[in-house]
Amino acid sequence: MLEINKIHQMNCFDFLDQVENKSVQLAVIDPPYNLSKADWDSFDSHNEFLPFTYRWIDKVLDKLDKDGSLYIFNTPFNCAFICQYLVSKGMIFQNWITWDKRDGMGSAKRGFSTGQETILFFSKSKNHTFNYDEVRVPYESTDRIKHASEKGILKNGKRWFPNPNGRLCGEVWHFSSQRHKEKVNGKTVKLTHITPKPRDLIERIIRASSNPNDLVLDCFMGSGTTAIVAKKLGRNFIGCDMNAEYVNQANFVLNQLEIN
């Protein structure tokens, strides 16, 4: 088995062939979207993209333990195919999550503009880890909370006490994209990786679907966000990327976390 708590420079297929089967509790995958934003994201056609996608999915599924969970990022269009494929492989559908990026609304003129991505959440069994109390979010209606907190009764007469940690998390997630967060004087700056995911978004996934010392896998590590967040949360990780610059930079950050 490859060394854990390290990002390896290799392609996803060679990497997955060397990861022990049924050793992973959580896989968080941000793969190519076939949007031609870079060489690694470019395919001749959708008919070429799908077999590539299904191939790495098959290998990832072998690595999940019997109660493992899988999250996959992609466009809504691609996720329609991926969702159907995962169901055909016997995976259990949990959620179709919409990530509202709150920026980058695009320039669509023949349809609604896009400012969101899809995150598919599947599990291998009904006994998968899900720590719902770890990912509660603030209540939206403060008046309702105030009334219930003071009297223990809602205005409709039902008895209810708000959870001090917030309400249960839903399927629409509001996180600004990393490129939006790192704007300078209102202008987008060039990032090392073109599509890094926000750390707080990845943190929500890892907190919800893994426990301390679990192994988290990402076979398209990019700038290393999954590994960095996993390490900070006390999880083990293993991952790869083909880009030497991404891998070296991410491993440097991880080593600094170790030192500190």
From Swiss-Prot:
List, alphabetically, the GO terms of the cellular component aspect: cytoplasm
Q: Does the keyword Phosphoprotein apply?
A: no
Which reactions appear under catalytic activity for this entry?
a 2'-deoxyadenosine in DNA + S-adenosyl-L-methionine = an N(6)-methyl-2'-deoxyadenosine in DNA + S-adenosyl-L-homocysteine + H(+)
Record-listed E.C. numbers:
2.1.1.72
Top enzyme class, one word, equals transferase
Q: Give one GO term, molecular function aspect.
A: N-methyltransferase activity
User: Any idea which positions bind S-adenosyl-L-methionine?
Assistant: 12, 30, 197, 223-225, 241-242
Q: Could you list the residue ranges forming a coiled coil in this record? A: none
- Origin superkingdom: Bacteria
For this UniProt record, the keywords arranged alphabetically read as follows: DNA-binding, Methyltransferase, Restriction system, S-adenosyl-L-methionine, Transferase
Read off the Pfam families from this record: N6_N4_Mtase (PF01555)
Which Gene Ontology BP annotations are present? DNA restriction-modification system; methylation
Which InterPro entries does the UniProt entry name for this protein? DNA_methylase_N4/N6, DNA_methylase_N6_adenine_CS, RM_Methyltransferase, SAM-dependent_MTases_sf
Q: How does it assemble?
A: At low concentration exists as a monomer and homodimer. Probably binds to DNA as a monomer.
Q: What does this protein do?
A: It is not known if the cytosine of the complementary sequence TCTTC is also methylated by this enzyme.
Q: Which family does it belong to?
A: Belongs to the N(4)/N(6)-methyltransferase family.
Protein name, please? Type II methyltransferase M1.MboII
Q: Which gene encodes it?
A: mboIIM
